[in-house]
Amino acid sequence: MVLIRVLANLLILQLSYAQKASELIIGGDECNINEHRFLVALYTSRSRRFHCSGTLINQEWVLTAANCDRKNIRIKLGMHSKNVTNEDEQTRVPKEKFFCLSSKTYTKWDKDIMLIRLKRPVNDSPHIAPISLPSSPPSVGSVCRIMGWGTISPTKVSYPDVPHCANINLLDYEVCRAAHGGLPATSRTLCAGILEGGKDSCQGDSGGPLICNGQFQGILSWGVHPCGQRLKPGVYTKVSDYTEWIRSIIAGNTDVTCPP
């Protein structure tokens, strides 16, 4: 009973904060074409359907979620509209893919991360540029930016032509524990959303970035369906917990293991 009261009070406090912060929300609309130069789209050569997003972290490497892995992945960089091609759009295929513990094993709360080495590097251009790994973990209460080409309807699949962006709040992990049964006491994930609902990542946005105070802090891992439900924030892989693993692989130490 004590735990229930504590979590209830925490939810009330977080909801109060979210209601104030929601007045600042820009999202739910088309992203500015200049704000997502690091955002990439993943699709398969067979279906040609975009199923995930990812983040360019340097000219040769993309970070996304392990649940986005498919055979014959193609990676589209520099894209805004699916139907109107930018002059500097480029397509790449993976040269190598790295998972934690050299496997594809992950859970809803751990190790949902995939590092992709591109077969050919890309150059910076008007619509392509990497974003750095975070210098420090994010703080609860931060306003964070989500983006992607995922469905814009919470109940049916309705993929937009252009990426949509929204601002959500970084919440205490205990909020996600209260909202989603089965989460452990600790995990290498972030909890983010708008507790009164209406703003959320959704189907097709997996693997995309969570940008908090200008830093790349999270990778969309999972959420509930229908999307955008009240008191049901999303779960994001915590990038700052994996920076050492990422940097080691990029430096050539491919035998490095993920944090426990």
Curated annotation (Swiss-Prot):
Keyword Signal applies: yes
Disulfide bonds: C31-C165, C52-C68, C100-C258, C144-C212, C176-C191, C202-C227
Role this protein plays: Snake venom serine protease homolog that may act in the hemostasis system of the prey.
CDD domains: Tryp_SPc (cd00190)
Molecular function GO labels: toxin activity
Entry keyword annotation includes Nucleotide-binding: no
Name of the featured protein: Snake venom serine protease homolog
